[in-house]
Amino acid sequence: MLDISVIILTYKEEKHIERCIKSIKKYSDNIYIIDSYSTDNTIAISKSFNSTILQNKFINQSKQFAWALDNINFKTEWILRIDADEYLEDNLIIEIKNKLPNINKDIVGINLKRKHMFMDKWIKFGGRY
């Protein structure tokens, strides 16, 4: 397991949250769901994976993420923010496992390149690649 915590912002994400959490569980057990009072099964599904659930009124993504940073006592060196409808492919997880421990200690943040998928196809144009 990596020394990383994961923040997932949710609101009515029962359709996506299981796939997202399953991809994260391959490298971290420190999963924090910041939910905006979902009325579907988002919370129940997240709890079934032993995720930590916190709820906060949603204003915008930036404020919700900042709220998480201010209200969680992280015990890991790194924090990853991911949307509930996103997931990590195995090759990206391997790359994270191989590269993260070797990043210079002066670096405090990184940006991961992502594949944007639509209807099971990788979007490689329109500023998304």
Regions found by a protein language model. Name each.
Residues E18, D40-F49, N91-L92:
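Acidic helix N-cap motif at the loop->helix transition within catalytic regions
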Residues S36, N56, T76, I82-E86, ...:
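Short acidic donor-binding/metal-coordinating loop in glycosyltransferase active sites
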Residues S23, D35-A44, D83:
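A conserved acidic beta->alpha catalytic loop
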Residues Q61, E77, Y87, N91-K124:
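Conserved donor NDP-sugar-binding/catalytic core segment of glycosyltransferases
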Residues K22-I31:
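Short, acidic, metal-binding catalytic loop of nucleotide-sugar glycosyltransferases
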Residues A66-W78:
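Active-site nucleotide-sugar/metal-binding loop of Leloir-type enzymes
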Residues M1-S23:
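N-proximal low-complexity "stem/linker" segments adjacent to membrane-targeting elements
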Residues N56-Q64:
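A short, glycine-/small-residue-rich helix N-cap motif at loop->alpha-helix starts
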